[in-house]
Design a protein with these regions (language model features):
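Conserved short alpha-helical segments that host acidic/polar catalytic motifs at enzyme active sites
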Residues: 1-237
C-alpha cells in the first residue's frame, strides 16, 4: 500500500467527519493515537473534549443548545488494563465491556452497526491498542451500511501486529462532503507518524478544515513503561 501524506489527506478533504489515526512513533518507542471530530450543524459543533479518568468524553460547550445527545455525547477514549480503546461513538463502552468479559475486539462489535442517522448512516469506526511487556499491536474496525442501504451492515476489521516504526493507519467516517455523506471505502490509509506528540497534534489540527473542525485528542504511550502523554485541542474555548 502506498503511504499517503496525512497533511494532504486532511487539507484536501473539507469534511472527513470523524477520524482515527493509530500507529507507532518514528523512533519506535511510542504507541500513538489521534482522534478528531468535525461538525456541519450547530449541534455537532457545540462540543468539546474533556478528560475523564484515563480517557476522554465529549461534552456540550453550551448546554442550552444541546440536541439529540445520544449520538454526540459519548466517551471516545477509554482504557482497560493494557488496552486503549478509541471510537466515534458509544461503542467505546461496548468494546470495553466485551474485552472485560474476555471477548475479542471484533466479537464485541458484532452487537453494533452503523449509526441510525438516515440518510447518512454514519459508519462506526473503532480502534484498540494493546501495549504489553514491550510489545505493541492494534486493530481497527468500520461498521457501515451497504452503499447507503441500511438493510445490510458491512463489517471490516483490520489487525496490525508488531507495528513498524514511523507508520500508522488512518480511517475516517466519510469519503468527503456530500448529501448524503458517502461512507469511507477501502482499507485504513497508510500514513507517517512523527516522534513528537506536539508536532503530531499540530499537524492534525492545522490540516483540518477551519470551519468544520471541533476537537482533537492525541496520545503517545511509552511501549516500555505504559506511561502516556495526552493533548486535547478544542475549537470552542
Amino acid at each position: 500500500m502506498k503511504k499517503v501524506s496525512l497533511e494532504q489527506e486532511l487539507k484536501g478533504n473539507a469534511y472527513p467527519g470523524r477520524g482515527i489515526v493509530i500507529g507507532r512513533s518514528k523512533d519506535g518507542t511510542k504507541a500513538v493515537a489521534g482522534y478528531f471530530i468535525m461538525g456541519r450543524s450547530q449541534n455537532s459543533r457545540n462540543r468539546v473534549f474533556v478528560e475523564e479518568g484515563e480517557g476522554i468524553r465529549t461534552q456540550a460547550f453550551d448546554p442550552s443548545k444541546l440536541e439529540a445527545p445520544s449520538l454526540i455525547i459519548y466517551a471516545p477514549v477509554r482504557v482497560l488494563g493494557n488496552d486503549t480503546i478509541v471510537t466515534n461513538g458509544d461503542q467505546t463502552d461496548t468494546v470495553y465491556e466485551g474485552l472485560e468479559q474476555g471477548k475479542t475486539f471484533e466479537v464485541s462489535l458484532r452487537s453494533r452497526e452503523f449509526e441510525p442517522d438516515a440518510p447518512n448512516y454514519t459508519p462506526r469506526i473503532s480502534g484498540v491498542m494493546h501495549v504489553e511487556n514491550g510489545t505493541y499491536g492494534y486493530q481497527m474496525s468500520i461498521l457501515k451500511s451497504n452503499n447507503g442501504d441500511p438493510s445490510q451492515c458491512n463489517r471490516y476489521t483490520f489487525s496490525y501486529d508488531n507495528c513498524v516504526a514511523g507508520e500508522g493507519h488512518f480511517i475516517h467516517t466519510y469519503m468527503h462532503d456530500g448529501n448524503p455523506l458517502p461512507s469511507f471505502e477501502g482499507e485504513p490509509k497508510l500514513v507517517e507518524i512523527p516522534d513528537d506528540i506536539d508536532a503530531f497534534t499540530e499537524l492534525l489540527w492545522s490540516s483540518l478544515n477551519e470551519d468544520n473542525k471541533v476537537s482533537l485528542f492525541t496520545r503517545y504511550i511509552d511501549i516500555a513503561t505504559g506511561k502516556y502523554e495526552t493533548r486535547i485541542v478544542n475549537k470552542n474555548k
